[in-house]
């Protein structure tokens, strides 16, 4: 029977980055950190900390977090807290333990001094309380009690975060501000997660993370994972799919398995690695002396079953009939994360899972349902599910995005099934239409929209995100795991404040808003198009003219990146030296490297165009390209040398001049040429062309009227999509509405002359998560009947054959999808355009209207009327 994860009353969930509070506000909240003496419990007084008490019989994970907390106190106050295993209180102290497993805490509960009714039996719940008179002669004590071992961990790290220790203190070198006095206010607070399993997938880790780990730790080993597990737990995550490119977590370092369990982590294996077995193990002689044979369940069933049994036996090798805590992946894909044969029947996959569950039951000695399991509906496996594949009720069904951040399918039935549902999401990917592995290209607004929808539709049991090398995707990882802890708290206001709060935690209050703005703008710009998809042909470059060049779309992107980099440099100049290593990693390098890449391709495009025209200005752009190519290497070298080379090798992904979906072998500069007979000091300038009168652009957020209903309302969400703001209906997850329901937005437009109009409605791309044949909206002009428009993008992991697959590929390449609608015979003047909601998961970004003038029908013209009366009454 699983521990309950139902919501317990929460007095004050203060301890997350998204809700990071001001000191004044925190001092008014119960059981909260305060840096002013408000008669609270002094955690640190004049640099001296309270001792920490932990039970001698405590779980190793609880002892480890007590030790980590002692070090965190030292980071803040300068002195490490003493750790005691005393079974009674003789002075004020910090008591860390698990309900029912800690003598001191249990006695406080029995004496009525600590009410734990809100967390008892709740999955990973914790309570932080200042207890008065906990023992004779002791005025007060700070109790951190977990309903289970991870509850105790999360409660302890919650305090660490609020006293100023960032979860990224090691993985991004975020410094800790020194405090001589730290107090905990009176009272009690509780918190617990809304999503059961919350984790990351380390993937596509060659050459970056692998090369870095080899230099830093001697390999992807327990020393590296100890740092990574610490980060995940501080971010209130509990789950990981470990690195798997040629790696085997349980074999590569004998210490890995026990380390994960001793730190409180839940181990898993990726979507195509069943029964706790890494894919690499199948081909290792130590596990398969005969080499394993073909990964084909129809022809090699006996060997595969032996292999799987070995995985479950290893999971149960902890002793005393207890497993190393795991979430067991079931199911099967082809060898090397490929689809199984095209004629694979649904019945075979059902048989695979049936046999796997029989092995689980046999090895554990318990019904299979008592071992947590997950079946990933990834790529073609989702198709089998759509066609009726039967899945045991206790197995968590893990839906997936399309590898580009668009969730493919969500629950439509049995939402309350025992195993529940989850989502596998991507911040990194290797596959069509192009790999993206180099840098952070995540817009957290899009993550919020897709995961908020997923949660609303019932995906509440597992959220796991592919993070590639982990760096440099720190900010989106922080957001994803914070949201996973409590999606209900991550409303649009919390979303908009998130970047500023992350910056405040990382760099202090002074520059928080400026850095937050840089992070938001970067996320929006970078998400528009993956850098691996950029080249000199990506955007229209403009036209050759004199004395100034006529700018095209490429110039607009170049300018906004240059402005962002200039703004970053201004903030950098105000950054304190102790914050600079973190600033470089989290802010400067991402912005400078992407700005540099855009400038390089922009210059390469103009060089090519001007050389073809024999224009000497080509030489200016040739120099720019060469400068940019050198700067890219210099930025990489600086990243690898900062903090005495701590991150050497981490930013080694090839990211220039892709030709196919897969990455090139090495960095190459775009081809440039010179006009040798020309001067090299020619000035270059640009002029932008105004929007023609025949074109009007309206931001989706600039509606003149929003018609809601009692259950849903239109909401503007900044930094969602590429426009001023994305406009969505909240709450998400509701069923269809009709045109008669009039859940709509109204826009005003001006037709410059009589004629026709072509409307282009730009949307943030989304997928039909119901498999109902597409997503619909309706549009109407003035009082004319509404027309329904729809789109149905079909994600594919291979070649795009159908129109729907080709449309999907273009949508993820450009990070937008457009619908077109033609309207005939509009009179000159003002008109009202109405956009109606029909289906969920629509994000409106922008409206573009192109007008085409034509002759007004004679019967309606003034000339026609005059001629009619002339004929009727006669004229000379």
What are the language-model segments listed below?
Residues 11-21:
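Bacterial N-terminal signal peptides
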Residues 27-192, 753:
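Contiguous, structured surface segment used for ligand recognition
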Residues 168-218, 223-243, 419-422, 694-697:
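An acidic-aromatic substrate-binding cleft motif
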Residues 175-183, 251-254, 259-262, 294-418, ...:
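Gly/Pro-rich turn-and-neighbor structural signature
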Residues 176-179, 499-655, 743-745:
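C-terminal non-catalytic alpha-helical accessory regions
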Residues 198-208, 215-220, 231-234, 261-263, ...:
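Aromatic- and acidic-residue-enriched carbohydrate-binding clefts of CAZyme catalytic domains
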Residues 233, 238-241, 247, 399-405, ...:
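Structured mid-domain segments that build the active-site/substrate or prosthetic-cofactor binding neighborhood
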Residues 663-876:
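Extracytoplasmic
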């Amino acid at each position: 029977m699983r521990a309950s994860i139902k919501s317990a009353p929460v007095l004050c969930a203060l301890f997350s980055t998204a809700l990071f509070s001001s000191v004044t506000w925190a001092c008014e909240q119960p059981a909260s950190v305060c840096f002013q003496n408000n008669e609270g419990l002094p955690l640190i007084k004049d640099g001296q900390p309270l001792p920490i008490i932990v039970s001698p019989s405590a779980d190793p994970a609880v002892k480890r977090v007590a030790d980590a907390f002692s070090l965190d106190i030292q980071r803040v106050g300068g002195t490490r807290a003493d750790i005691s295993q005393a079974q009674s209180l003789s002075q004020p102290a910090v008591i860390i333990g698990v309900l029912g497993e800690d003598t001191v805490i249990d006695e406080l509960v029995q004496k009525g001094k600590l009410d734990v009714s809100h967390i008892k039996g709740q999955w990973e719940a914790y309570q932080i309380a200042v207890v008065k008179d906990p023992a004779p002669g002791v005025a007060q004590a700070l109790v951190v009690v977990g309903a289970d071992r991870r509850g105790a961990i999360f409660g302890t790290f919650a305090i660490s975060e609020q006293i100023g220790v960032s979860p990224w203190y090691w993985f991004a070198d975020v410094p800790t501000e020194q405090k001589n006095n730290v107090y905990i206010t009176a009272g009690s607070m509780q918190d617990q997660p809304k999503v059961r399993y919350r984790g990351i997938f380390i993937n596509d880790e060659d050459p970056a993370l692998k090369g870095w780990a080899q230099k830093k730790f001697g390999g992807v080993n327990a020393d590296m994972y100890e740092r990574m597990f610490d980060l995940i737990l501080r971010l209130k995550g509990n789950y990981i799919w470990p690195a798997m490119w040629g790696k085997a977590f349980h074999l590569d370092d004998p210490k890995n398995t026990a380390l994960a369990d001793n730190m409180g982590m839940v181990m898993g294996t990726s979507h195509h690695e069943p029964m706790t077995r890494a894919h690499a193990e199948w081909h290792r002689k130590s596990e398969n002396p005969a080499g394993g044979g073909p990964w084909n369940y129809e022809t090699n069933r006996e060997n595969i079953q032996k292999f799987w049994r070995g995985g479950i036996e290893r999971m149960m090798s902890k002793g005393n009939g207890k497993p190393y805590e795991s979430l067991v992946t079931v199911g099967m894909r082809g060898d090397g994360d490929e689809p199984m044969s095209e004629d694979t029947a649904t019945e075979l996959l059902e048989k695979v899972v049936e046999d796997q569950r029989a092995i689980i039951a046999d090895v554990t000695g318990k019904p299979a349902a008592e071992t947590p399991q997950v079946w990933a509906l990834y790529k073609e496996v989702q198709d089998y599910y759509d066609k009726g594949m039967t899945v045991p009720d206790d197995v968590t069904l893990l839906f997936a995005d399309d590898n580009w951040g668009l969730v493919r399918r969500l629950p439509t039935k049995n939402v309350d099934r025992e195993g529940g549902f989850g989502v596998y999401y991507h911040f990194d990917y290797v596959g069509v239409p192009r790999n993206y592995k180099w840098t952070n290209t995540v817009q957290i607004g899009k993550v919020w929209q897709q995961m908020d929808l997923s949660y609303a539709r019932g995906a509440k049991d597992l959220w796991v995100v592919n993070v590639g090398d982990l760096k440099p995707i720190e900010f989106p990882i922080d957001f994803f795991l914070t949201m996973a802890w409590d999606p209900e708290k991550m409303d649009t206001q919390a979303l908009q404040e998130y970047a500023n709060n992350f910056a405040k935690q990382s760099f202090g209050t002074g520059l928080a808003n400026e850095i937050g703005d840089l992070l938001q703008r970067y996320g929006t710009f970078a998400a528009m198009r993956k850098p691996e998809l950029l080249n000199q042909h990506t955007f229209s470059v403009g036209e050759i003219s004199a004395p100034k060049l006529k700018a095209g779309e490429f110039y607009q992107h170049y300018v906004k990146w240059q402005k962002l980099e200039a703004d970053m440099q201004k903030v950098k100049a105000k950054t304190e030296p102790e914050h600079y290593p973190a600033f470089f990693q989290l802010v400067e390098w991402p912005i400078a490297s992407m700005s540099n890449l855009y400038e390089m391709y922009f210059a390469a495009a103009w060089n090519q165009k001007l050389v073809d025209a024999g224009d000497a200005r080509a030489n200016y752009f040739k120099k720019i390209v060469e400068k940019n190519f050198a700067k890219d290497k210099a930025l990489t070298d600086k990243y690898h040398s900062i903090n005495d080379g701590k991150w050497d090798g981490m930013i080694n992904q090839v990211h220039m001049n892709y030709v196919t979906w897969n990455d090139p072998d090495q960095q190459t500069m775009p081809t440039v040429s010179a006009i040798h007979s020309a001067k090299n000091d020619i000035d270059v300038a640009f002029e932008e062309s105004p929007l023609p009168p025949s074109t009007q652009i309206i931001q989706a957020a600039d509606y003149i009227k929003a018609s809601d209903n009692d259950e849903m309302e239109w909401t503007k969400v900044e930094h969602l999509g590429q426009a001023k703001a994305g406009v969505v209906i909240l709450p998400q997850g509701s069923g269809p509405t009709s045109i008669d329901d009039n859940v709509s937005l109204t826009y005003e437009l001006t037709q410059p002359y009589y004629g026709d109009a072509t409307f282009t409605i730009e949307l943030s791309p989304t997928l039909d998560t119901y498999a109902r044949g597409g997503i619909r909206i309706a549009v109407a002009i003035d009082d004319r009947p509404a027309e329904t428009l729809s789109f149905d993008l079909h994600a594919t992991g291979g070649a795009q054959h159908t129109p729907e697959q080709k449309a999907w590929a273009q949508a993820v390449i450009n990070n937008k999808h457009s619908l077109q609608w033609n309207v005939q015979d509009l009179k000159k003047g003002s008109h009202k355009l109405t956009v109606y909601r029909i289906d969920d998961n629509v994000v409106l970004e922008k409206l573009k209207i192109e007008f085409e003038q034509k002759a007004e029908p004679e019967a309606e013209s003034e000339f026609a009327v005059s001629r009619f009366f002339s004929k009727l009454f006669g004229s000379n």
